[in-house]
UniProtKB/Swiss-Prot annotation:
GO terms for biological process: negative regulation of gene expression; rRNA 3'-end processing. Residues 592-601, 822-833, 1018-1031, 1076-1088, 1139-1174 have a biased composition (Basic and acidic residues). Putative RNA exonuclease which protects neurons from the toxic effects of expanded poly-Q disease proteins. It is unknown whether this is via participation in the pathogenic mechanism underlying poly-Q-induced neurodegeneration or if it is by acting as a genetic modifier of the age of onset or progression of neurodegeneration. Regulates gene expression in neurons. Pfam families: EloA-BP1 (PF15870). This is Putative RNA exonuclease pqe-1. SUPFAM superfamilies: Ribonuclease H-like (SSF53098). Expressed in the excretory canal, vulval cells, the intestine and in head and tail neurons including ASH, RIC and AIZ neurons. The Gln/Pro-rich N-terminus and the Arg/Asp/Glu/Lys-rich charged domain are critical in protecting glutamatergic ASH sensory neurons from degeneration. ASH neurons expressing isoforms lacking these domains show progressive degeneration.
Length: 1647
């Protein structure tokens, strides 16, 4: 709705949509004016019609003369809705002298009721134009002087819902302090005008040369207004506020003539003197409010005019006119930059660069951007509109070199130059985007806020008498309200009213505070902190690439940069020179020409403050980390300087790892390095070449590496100290040094006991230990006191505090002991640990007897370390000191065990018994998981002490407890002095307590979980150790009893013979007890673990310190110590695994036991009178499992003839079933063979054969060798067994079950209930029936028309005599069965490969060209052993290659022309005998070039008589006679007398259309004969399988008829068509006798 006061005059008029009343008088809501009217108003500001007030209100030049109202076109409700959706408007601030608000309603509805005349108004406008005051403000001031008659009340002034109440007040307000000015956040309105404001292009200020003698803040910069000549300049001031706010008051300027030859954008600025409005508040209340809002009254300097006050002193709602000020740049989000960055935008004396794009070359770039309504927007002088710099889409072709600058595609180089020339503020993200898209030779890096200030410009400003400020005073921002942002460019082309005295005072106050702040920052930079406290240098990711490209020349289009005033970001005051540094430029003479220099800031690096944790030292890897030289400085502060060489690595991670680890150190060299004390925030201006900059970068990298090496060196020194202290303490406790200890270790370990016991000499003893030379380390630490001083001065705060705490603990006379270190007071098993490595052999270090596993030496590494360094500090590497050789067990040297004295052993055993009651808590120190799992951990029981001793230990200070430890049994002297590990444990405890107060991090939680798992693992190890020790004690007690008995017998009888006899008897008793145990009890005994140390039954080992480590890898087995040599092996031998026979016996026993239980349960259920359904189901299941037959299965009873008078014989138990002989034969159906041999064996038993088992095995093996297929074997073995049974029953008479005995007939029987003929089944022999009686019975087996079509029988459509149609089946649906004459491609029916005929139509022959399986797939095995195998070779399906080979491919595809050669059977004639005939036929085919062809036709009747047997010669060449299936040879085919035509003639003599033909898969026979017939009985469909598939005739014969046909795979005899036809006849008779066998077919037919 809002047009903004400019645009096309005829396209938009608000009066056509909104009423005049009540919002007409608000500026910005009047009718729009075009650009020409705006130009006239700007060029003639002194006219009565061109006042800014009218321009703001949107009225035309003659709006004041119009009196006729404008007709309304919409309702008031519609107008209100439109106003609510419009952008929020804020009226122009009214000057101080005027307090009355504008009354829009009175100005529009009653224009004649004004208090002054038109002539007075014109005069006021002229005076205001001469004095620089807007005419409307002058008119308002004059009206206020006349009176307040027209002041509206609060109810009369219409207010919007979005306007605050403070808009009605016109009292100027003092600005807030600069640091407290809040940033206005733009409100994204839904109105289009608000969206256009947010997307408004950024306005770039134009900087022009400064006139001599004029301060920068007094210059009003000008740019050319739209559609105005080059000589007309208009000032534009920004208006900050909410999105959609109204513009400030405008002021038109006189045109300034341009000099000849001067471009419009280079025109010199003109200073405009503005006189503030002289007026006072309308009433005393307003004046009082104005005074309350300006509490700080600063006196005006003498000689300073109000219009000379810089614009920074204006208040947020001041009434005084405001001069030009620069608004901070806006980012893409629309938020303003921070107020502190506003003062860094200075005017540079550099001519503007030509615009990148746009029609006008003389105007700046942003002047060409279209406005919200299509008009061009022009930025004002000194105004920085929001910059919107974004990247182009990824698929844009200019994405790598250009950016989207305020909706314009601009090269990144031009944007960089524009930002550098105007000193614009950009954020890091925009700067990174620009640098990424700069050319290679322009990718320089500038810091935030522009470039540093050259010293020559500072000197020039000091010589000119100007204040030596690096920047103009920061612009005084008005208080940003929620609705004060400009909505378009025309609103910002108004001049703020002049400053008031209070605002000028506030300006001076702010300038004074800013200068004091700068002086304070300069003082801070002159006294910089030490170098070691400076932060590390942070370089951008692309800095290295920018440095390499910085020395290349700049392109020709970039103008040379002239040193200008730039802000100082580091806080250095502008009136003082920068601090001296090594990078300051050399002073040049005044005659020398200024050359462009590469100005880059240099910030002195500060090493990071990384805390050093002594309790968790960093474990370094000797193979990955290298430190060449470690030197110690003598001057204060003492620092450890580390020199490293950069390894050549391919990645940063490898370099970091390789630089962090120490290697063998060289000789000690003391070196001093000069360090420059430079403040961390000091900016150093360097004008040196690229080589110096590169050297500087390398120095930074070296400094970083030195800092990292310093950290590692400190950790190494602390670790060495701790190890040496522990060695010294250990040497003190163990006075006797082993003989095989090296000389260097002896030198370190020899410390007098008196010195270690005395509190005052403990430090000297440690010092003496530290000063001893070492053989392998090259760094020599002089004394502990001196080194502690060095460490106190290390500039690392956290590590310094922790180190001081550790040192104080070491220097205390009574160190605090860890409350959980009670395990040091007992003797426990030594721990031996080893490290896993992929390259090195594991090195084992023994744990001392009196040292606890909680010590830091045995603690795990920090969880933050790498996996390669997680071994722990307890591993002794190859290059460690010689003083640790006593703890290392080599590969070739034996393990020596320390012996305990008898008192210690007794005391340890007594404490072990009381361990369950008084058991100390376990340590929470995390240990390595692998080490805790593999290394056995000793017990932690305390020594037994009396109550008095415990009471004394509580009263004794912590430091003296270890000095007063005594044994309750023998009151010996105190053992040892406290070691360094106790102090370390105390510090660790204090640190843990502190860490509990703060919330735990993720790493700490994981560490606690890890410690908990380790404690659980340790508990399990202790339990196993206790059990082993209990067994050992039991064994020792038994041995002690035996010894005592021997001693008693020796004392009683001094004869040695009696003693030896008693010993022999005792050994015999033990052996007898062992033999008395049964085998089952021995198997149930729990075997001892193999990895435990074997116990001895012959001797007692007093030291009890055997070492055993389970070897994880066989490659390191030689380095792992073996078991104790003094211990015998385990007593119980491991039982061998049972063999196959034993396993079978065990399974048979279990099976028999289960069958016995099932029989008992079945018998119990049978004896019950009443059984439930569940019990019946259970009985059926048991009967099935036991194979119990409930009823008689046979209908005939067989009676054996027995010799009369034969005595009754006792029945013998059934002999065992023999095993099969050869497992290699029929390996796929072994289970079937085992079942079959049992049947054969039972049959031979019935024959009373003397060697039934052997005969049964041989008989079964012969059948298995003959039939290699499982299915054939199962069928034939059944036939053979049936034949054997018939031979056995040859002498037994069969008696019919329904027959009546002769005695009953003679006796007569009861006549009343005679049931001779009732219910008797009569058996009909269908074979004896005549054909006339048999024909009606066979009609039910005929195939229907749908079945004929489905099974691909040749059919004629609608009685047509043309070509027949043959449907596709599941076997032929993926094959093209009928081909065109020109098609030469074929598919082989055997190998299923595609081949082509020769061009002349013949077949190509080649040796072994076709490899195939001649039999189908058989399914063998049950569900768990289900396999598909070929019946021909018994190989696995889809895996084995073909077992047969042929020289030619064959096919069953036919030409399409063959479909027209089919003939139908003749139509029956009256009284035709052929109509009642039934024949069974079978055909044999051979392969020809034209496909399968008929070679033999055989037909029989139902009485099994041969009717027809014809041999047919095919019309084309025969490729393969297919002898193995057809049974025909090439000689028979070539000598065949008949052809297909003669065969048809012979066939039709017996067959007509009503004759029933029987066959198996008869559709293939009819296709070969080329005959169409519908009365068909197909045995393949009649006896289908349950899976609805066809069953082979051979299988049906064996299964139903128990007859084998078609020979075998191996004999290659082939099929006999006569045999197949007779088999079909037998199957039909079987179906008549057993109608249930064809029920499946009927069900399928009904479906």
């Amino acid at each position: 709705m809002f047009n903004g006061g400019y645009g096309s005059g005829n396209s938009f008029n608000l009066q056509n949509y909104a009423p005049i009343d009540p919002m007409t008088g608000i500026p910005g809501f009047g009718p729009s004016q075009n650009a020409q009217q705006q130009q006239q108003q700007a060029s003639a500001p002194g006219t009565s019609s061109g006042g800014p007030s009218q321009a703001v209100s949107g009225a035309s030049s003659g709006a004041s003369m119009k009196t006729e109202p404008v007709a309304r076109q919409v309702s008031t409700a519609q107008m209100k809705r439109d106003l609510e959706q419009a952008a929020v408007y804020v009226p122009t601030p009214i000057p101080e002298g005027s307090t009355q608000p504008q009354q829009r309603q009175q100005q529009q509805s009653q224009p004649q009721a004004r208090q002054m005349s038109t002539q007075q108004a014109a005069n006021l406008r002229k005076n205001a134009a001469a004095a620089g005051t807007p005419p409307k403000q002058a008119m308002q001031g004059a009206s206020r002087e006349q009176g307040n008659a027209h002041q509206p009340t609060a109810g009369q002034i219409p207010q919007s819902s979005n306007q605050p109440a403070q808009q009605t007040h016109n009292v100027p307000r003092m600005p807030q302090p600069l640091q407290q000015v809040p940033h206005p956040s733009p409100v994204r309105g839904s109105h289009p005008a608000a969206q256009q404001v947010q997307n408004a292009p950024q306005r770039i200020p134009q900087h022009v040369p400064m006139p001599q003698g004029v301060a920068p803040h007094q210059v009003i910069q000008q740019v050319r207004a739209p559609n105005i000549g080059a000589s007309q300049m208009v000032q534009q001031a920004p208006s900050r506020g909410h999105t959609g706010a109204a513009p400030a008051s405008r002021m038109a300027q006189q045109p300034v003539p341009l000099h000849q030859g001067v471009a419009p954008h280079q025109a010199a600025p003109q200073t405009i003197q503005q006189t503030p409005a002289r007026g006072r508040p309308a009433n005393a209340q307003l004046a009082q409010n104005a005074q309350q809002r300006n509490p700080q009254q600063v006196p005006m300097p003498q000689g300073v005019a109000p219009h000379h006050i810089p614009p920074q002193a204006l208040g947020p709602h001041g009434a005084a006119p405001q001069m030009t000020q620069q608004a901070p740049a806006r980012g893409p989000s629309g938020a303003a930059q921070h107020a502190q960055n506003a003062h860094r935008m200075t005017h540079q004396q550099v001519p503007l660069q030509a615009p990148v794009q746009g029609p006008h070359r003389g105007a700046p770039q942003m002047a060409q951007q279209p406005g919200p309504h299509g008009a061009a927007q022009h930025p004002s002088s000194g105004t920085v509109a929001p910059m919107h710099i974004t990247s182009l889409p990824g698929n844009h072709p200019l994405n790598r070199t250009h950016l989207l600058f305020n909706r314009q595609v601009v090269p990144a180089l031009d944007i960089r130059n524009l930002i550098a020339q105007h000193r614009l503020m950009v954020d890091d993200f925009v700067r990174a985007q620009i640098c990424y898209r700069l050319p290679e030779n322009h990718q320089d890096y500038w810091p935030p806020g522009g470039h540093p200030i050259p010293m020559q410009q500072q000197q020039m400003r000091q010589g000119a008498g100007l204040p030596n400020m690096a920047m103009p005073p920061p612009p005084l921002m008005r208080h940003p309200g929620p609705h004060q942002n400009p909505i378009h460019a025309m609103q910002s082309m108004q001049v703020q009213p002049p400053l008031s005295p209070d605002q000028m005072n506030m300006q001076m106050f702010q300038q004074r505070a800013l200068m004091m702040q700068q002086q304070a920052m300069q003082m801070q930079m002159q006294n910089p902190p030490p170098v070691h406290q400076q932060p590390p240098p942070q370089q951008p990711p692309q800095q290295q690439r920018q440095k390499q490209q910085r020395s290349q020349p700049a392109p020709a289009r970039v103008p040379p940069q002239v040193p200008s005033q730039v802000p100082v970001t580091g806080g250095v005051a502008a009136d003082e020179p920068p601090p001296p540094c090594s990078y300051s430029p050399v002073a040049q003479s005044s005659e020398s020409k200024i050359e462009p220099v590469d100005v880059k800031p240099r910030v002195a690096p500060v090493p990071p403050q990384v805390p050093v944790t002594p309790t968790k030292p960093v474990i370094t890897n000797n193979k990955k980390k290298r430190i060449d030289v470690v030197t110690l400085d003598e001057d204060a502060p003492r620092r450890v300087q580390v020199k490293q060489e950069i390894p050549e690595v391919s990645s940063t991670s490898d370099a970091t790892k390789s630089d962090a680890a120490p290697t063998a150190r060289g000789a000690v060299r003391i070196k001093q390095e000069v360090e420059s004390d430079v403040a961390p925030n000091t900016i150093l201006i360097s004008a040196k070449k690229f080589e110096r900059m590169k050297a500087e970068a390398e120095d930074k990298e070296d400094m970083k590496k030195k800092i990292a090496a310093l950290q590692e060196a400190l950790f190494n020194i602390q670790e060495e100290r701790r190890v040496e202290k522990e060695i010294a303490a250990f040497a003190t406790t163990n006075q006797a040094v082993p003989q095989n200890q090296p000389a260097s270790s002896v030198q370190i370990a020899q410390v007098s006991t008196s010195e270690s016991d005395a509190p005052g000499t403990s430090e000297a003893a440690a010092t003496e230990t530290m000063t001893s030379p070492k053989t392998k380390n090259n760094v020599i630490v002089e004394t502990e006191g001196e080194q502690e001083e060095d460490e106190d001065e290390i500039p690392i705060k956290k590590s310094k505090k922790r180190r001081a705490k550790i040192v104080s603990n070491d220097e205390e006379e009574e160190p605090v002991r860890h409350p959980k270190r009670r395990s040091d007071e007992k003797r426990e098993k030594r721990h031996v640990s080893y490290a896993e490595s992929d390259d090195d052999m594991p090195v084992v270090k023994k744990k001392r007897r009196n040292q606890s596993p909680e010590d830091p030496e045995y603690s795990a590494a920090s969880p933050s370390e790498d996996e390669d360094d997680d071994i722990g500090s307890f591993v002794v590497s190859d290059n460690e000191d010689d003083d640790a050789d006593s703890f290392v067990v080599g590969d070739d040297e034996p393990i020596e065990y320390e012996e305990e004295d008898e008192d210690d052993m007794i005391e340890r055993r007594s404490s072990r018994k009381r361990r369950s009651d008084s058991r100390s808590k376990k340590s929470a120190t995390p240990t390595d998981r692998r080490r805790s799992r593999d290394t056995p951990t000793g017990s932690r029981s305390m020594r037994s002490t009396s109550p008095n001793d415990r009471r004394k230990s509580r009263e004794t200070p912590p430091g003296n407890r270890s000095m007063r430890r005594t044994s309750p049994s023998d009151g010996r002297k105190s053992r040892d002095t406290p070691t360094a590990s106790s102090s370390m444990s105390s510090s660790t405890l204090s640190y843990c307590k502190k860490s509990k107060e703060t919330p735990m991090s993720y790493e700490e939680i994981e560490q606690q979980k890890k410690a908990k798992r380790q404690r659980n693992c340790k508990t399990r190890e202790e339990n196993r150790e206790r059990k082993r020790l209990a067994q050992l004690e039991e064994l020792e007690s038994s041995e002690t009893t035996g010894v005592r008995r021997t001693l008693r017998s020796t004392q009683d009888n001094s004869d040695p013979l009696d003693a030896s006899l008693a010993t022999t008897i005792e050994e015999f008793r033990k052996t007898k007890k062992k033999d008395a145990k049964s085998s089952e009890n021995r198997a149930k005994e729990k075997q001892k673990p193999m990895n435990k140390r074997p116990t001895s039954s012959a001797s007692v080992d007093s030291n009890d310190d055997g070492v055993h480590i389970p070897a994880k890898r066989m490659a390191h087995a030689s380095s792992v110590p073996g078991p104790s040599r003094s211990k015998p092996p385990m007593i119980g031998a491991v039982k061998n695994r049972p063999n196959h026979t034993e396993m079978l016996d065990k399974r048979n026993k279990e099976s028999e036991e289960k069958r016995r239980k099932d029989r008992d349960e079945l018998e119990r259920l049978r004896n019950k009178k009443h059984t439930t359904e569940e019990e019946k189901i259970k009985m059926a299941r048991l009967q099935n499992a036991l194979k119990v037959v409930g009823k008689a299965a046979g209908l005939k009873a067989t009676v054996k003839k027995e010799l009369t008078g034969s005595p009754a014989k006792k029945q013998k138990p059934a002999p065992a079933v023999p095993k099969i002989l050869d497992f290699s034969v029929g390996r796929t159906f072994t289970a079937i063979r085992q079942t079959a041999i049992k049947l054969v064996f039972d049959t031979f038993l019935e024959r009373d054969s003397p060697n039934a088992a052997r005969e049964a095995q041989e008989f079964e093996l012969s059948i298995a060798k003959q039939y290699t297929d499982g299915q054939k074997y199962r069928i034939n073995i059944g036939h053979k067994v049936a034949a054997l049974r018939k031979e056995n029953t040859s002498g037994i008479l069969e008696v019919n079950k329904n027959a009546v005995s002769h005695d009953k007939i003679l006796a007569g029987g009861p006549k009343d209930n005679c049931t001779v003929a009732r219910g008797r089944k009569t058996h009909v022999d269908h074979r004896q029936l005549s054909i006339e009686k048999l024909h009606p019975l066979l009609l039910q087996f005929k195939l229907t028309t749908s079945e004929l079509e489905t099974n691909a029988y040749p059919m004629r459509r609608d009685g047509s005599t043309k070509a027949v149609s043959i449907a596709d089946t599941v076997y032929t649906q993926n094959k093209k069965m009928f081909l065109d004459d020109y098609d030469m491609s074929r598919n082989c029916s055997r190998c299923n490969k595609e081949f082509k005929l020769s061009p002349n139509g013949t077949m190509i022959r080649s040796t072994g060209i076709c490899r195939y399986h001649n039999r189908g797939v058989a399914i063998n095995g049950k569900r768990d052993t289900f396999r598909k195998r070929y019946s021909c070779c018994n190989e696995e399906f889809n895996v084995a290659l073909g077992c047969k080979f042929s020289d030619v491919h064959v096919t069953d595809q036919l030409f399409k022309k063959e479909l027209s050669t089919f003939v139908s059977t003749p139509v029956p004639v009256p009284n035709d005998q052929r109509s009642t005939r039934v024949y069974a036929l079978d055909c044999e085919m051979v392969y020809t070039i034209a496909g399968p062809a008929l070679a033999r036709l055989t037909m029989v009747d139902m009485q099994r008589n041969r009717v027809l047997d014809v041999f047919v010669k095919p019309p084309t060449d025969v490729l393969d006679p297919n002898t193995e299936f057809s049974g025909l040879t090439m000689e028979q085919i070539n000598s065949a007398p008949d052809t297909l035509k003669t065969c048809h003639q012979k066939l039709f003599k017996y067959v007509n259309a009503d004759t029933i033909l029987i066959g198996h898969s008869l559709e293939s026979d009819l296709k070969a004969m080329r005959v169409v017939h519908k009365n068909v009985i197909d045995t393949a469909i009649l006896f289908r399988s349950t899976r609805d598939t066809k069953v082979a005739l051979k299988v049906l014969s064996a299964k139903l008829l128990h007859k084998n046909i078609q020979g075998d795979n191996e004999d290659a005899i082939g099929h006999d068509s006569m045999e197949d036809a007779l088999t079909c006849v037998d199957l039909i008779f079987y179906g008549l006798r057993n109608p249930e066998s064809i029920a499946i077919r009927e069900a399928n037919t009904n479906c």
